[in-house]
Structure formats: structure tokens, C-alpha cells
């Protein structure tokens, strides 16, 4: 994915040995495949950036969204514990209710207002339930050279339209 690709590239540029695995080759629904990859690579750390991210579509595919973001994350967290790997889980600001006008504190009340946010919160809870040492990073507005993202969309729309309407309430 977009974030994983950029992280692998940056870590390698800094001299780290990194084994990037795409979600096509590493389906989060298949514990046997995940176990085989982890056994083969023997990671010191796992950066879990894979996710079902189609926020609107998740409302129509809640089972698939939860399988990837919650159940898949739980499997990966259990494997990280079993193999003694440090764990970094990329989550989202969608775990919050979508109100307020300031950045959220780490322990702020979570109250997802959609299937996607609820599934990512279940992923966070799985990480906390299975691991004693972990990082959970809640991000939004991912952008980069690869993949679809807000910046690319805005650049394309700006070329196609005379004016644009864009949300202005994101902190």
C-alpha cells in the first residue's frame, strides 16, 4: 500500500533490512500465510500498515472491513507476540467521534461513527489485548507518490474544474 511502500523505501534508505509484503501476497485473513512469512523473515519489528480503507464502501461491506482491520490485525498481533517482534499498528482518526476543534489526546474518548472507524478501533483493542509493548499511531490524510490520495485527487480536480469545494474543518 501507499504508506507501507514509502516506509519500506525510507527504512531501506536509512540502512535497515526491511521485508515489505503487499496485502496481495500477505492476506490478513490467512494465518498460515502470515505465519510462513514471519517464520521466513524473522522480523525484529512488524509495521502493520495494511488496511481496508474504503470508508464509504465499508458501510456496504462491514464483514470484509472487519475481517481485514480487526480480525487480521488480531492474528498479526498474536503472531508478533509469539515471535517476539515489536509491533507498530497504523490506525486512524476515524476512531474518534468526528467532533471537536483541537487535536485529540492519546487517551481521548473513542466513539467511531462508521464501520471503518469501528473496525480500526477493534484492531487497536486486539493489539492492546495481545501485546504488552506496542505502538499505535492514528493518522489521517495519507499522501505520497504511490496510490490514491487526497493531494493527487485535488490536483486532478483542479485541472478539470474552475473551482472546488473542499472540507475546511480538519485539524
For each feature predicted by the language model, list its residue ranges.
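Structural signature of beta-strand start/N-cap positions in the alpha/beta core
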Residues: 17, 42-44, 86, 133-135, ...
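Short glycine-/acidic-enriched loop or helix-start segments at secondary-structure transitions
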Residues: 5-7, 57-58, 97-100, 146-147
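N-terminal Rossmann/SDR dinucleotide-binding element
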Residues: 1-45, 82, 123
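NAD(P)-dependent short-chain dehydrogenase/reductase
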Residues: 125-171
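A structural alpha-helix within SAM-dependent methyltransferase catalytic domains
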Residues: 38, 74-77, 81, 128, ...
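NAD(P)H-binding glycine-rich loop region in Rossmannoid oxidoreductase-like domains
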Residues: 31-68, 79-81
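SDR active-site strand-loop-helix element
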Residues: 21, 46-50, 87-92, 97, ...
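Catalytic helix-loop patch of NAD(P)-dependent Rossmann-fold dehydrogenases
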Residues: 60, 67, 72-75, 95-137, ...
Amino acid at each position: 500500500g501507499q504508506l507501507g511502500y514509502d516506509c519500506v523505501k525510507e527504512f531501506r534508505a536509512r540502512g535497515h533490512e526491511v521485508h515489505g509484503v503487499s496485502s496481495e501476497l500477505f492476506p490478513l485473513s490467512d494465518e498460515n500465510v502470515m505465519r510462513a512469512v514471519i517464520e521466513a523473515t524473522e522480523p525484529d519489528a512488524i509495521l502493520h500498515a495494511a488496511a481496508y480503507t474504503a470508508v464509504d464502501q465499508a458501510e456496504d461491506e462491514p464483514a470484509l472491513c472487519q475481517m481485514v482491520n480487526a480480525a487480521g490485525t488480531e492474528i498479526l498481533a498474536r503472531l508478533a507476540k509469539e515471535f517476539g517482534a515489536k509491533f507498530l499498528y497504523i490506525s486512524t482518526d476515524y476512531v474518534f467521534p468526528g467532533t471537536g476543534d483541537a487535536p485529540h489526546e492519546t487517551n481521548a474518548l473513542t466513539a467511531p461513527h462508521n464501520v471503518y472507524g469501528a473496525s480500526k478501533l477493534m484492531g487497536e483493542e486486539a493489539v492492546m489485548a495481545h501485546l504488552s509493548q506496542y505502538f499505535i499511531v492514528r493518522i489521517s490524510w495519507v499522501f505520497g507518490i504511490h496510490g490514491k490520495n487526497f493531494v493527487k485527487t485535488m490536483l486532478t480536480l483542479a485541472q478539470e474544474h474552475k473551482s472546488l469545494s473542499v472540507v475546511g474543518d480538519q485539524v
